[in-house]
Amino acid sequence: MDIKGIYHADANRYSDAEALYKRCGKSGILLPKISLGFWHNFGEVDSYERSRAITHYAFDHGITHFDLANNYGPPYGSAEETMGRLMKDDFKPYRDELFISTKAGYDMWEGPYGNWGSRKYLMASLNQSLKRMNLEYVDLFYSHRYDPNTPLEETLQAMVDIVKQGKALYLGISRWPLEALKFADQYLKERDCPLLIFQDRLNMLDHAPQENGTLDYCAENDIGFISFSPLAQGLLTDRYLNGIPADSRMAKEHFLKHSALTPELLEQLKKWNAEAGERDETLAEMALAWILQQKGVTSVLVGASSTAQLEKNMKCVHAKTLNS
């Protein structure tokens, strides 16, 4: 930022473009291999100036994709409000250089219409999201989860209509079972709104998208794939190799339980950490590189609590090829 506090993006932000970007499926969209997730660290309870510094660093280094959802915070909606404030304060001149996504599918407000995959919920949720983010449209809108009680046609047609209304440019789905993914792919293609991307958990400890055929289906049908929770809530870092830090997620036992760190897992993590050291990488860098080197993967969603953490994570783009 200049002396008046006005943000000016780094003139060299695309200098590493050849290494950083990858085509998403068969679309015209190139996504950064590392995308910035707003699940944590961008809520009302978090420092706005820190959020600002992280997004500045990201964009200054070519990370153009910011991933949000209606219920990110806490509290719900506050990550999108932070994005709206960032747009107003810093990123409005760069809107056409950003690829912003949001989602709807989990509980957001009280009553029968604030959850799941109904047309009413999806339409209302996106309208609210756009207001919070000070945007006329999002680049990508997701169904955040599969709804077993709403006809898939209702959910998908609502998403098609959202594109037709100009409120989203592309469509994605997250964590749908394979058969529902196949149905969505065909339904959307027939309506000239092809599925851009699928989002799911994939990391060195969780291979479900590979084991259940989802990743292969995406690769074979020109659908991008973006991984969340790439570091398994911090397990795939050096944070827990010598005990449980008092300020860690595992110490709070909210998303990550003590029971997750079994003696067998700890032994495996220490082996991987040693392997990473032999590669002159941290365990986190190697874990991110592993995902990016899997067939069919377009991008990895990372969170960041500091610019230093984001800087370290970005090194995986230039990582050496892993043996397996």
Label for each model-derived stretch:
Residues 1-98:
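N-terminal binding-site loop/beta-alpha segment at the start of enzyme catalytic domains
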Residues 45-59, 117-133, 181-185:
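Short, acidic/polar
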Residues 46-50, 78, 82, 113-121, ...:
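Alpha-helix N-cap and loop-to-helix initiation/capping positions
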Residues 57, 61, 133, 165-166, ...:
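Structural motif
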Residues 110-142, 201-205:
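Active-site gating/metal-coordination segments in enzymes
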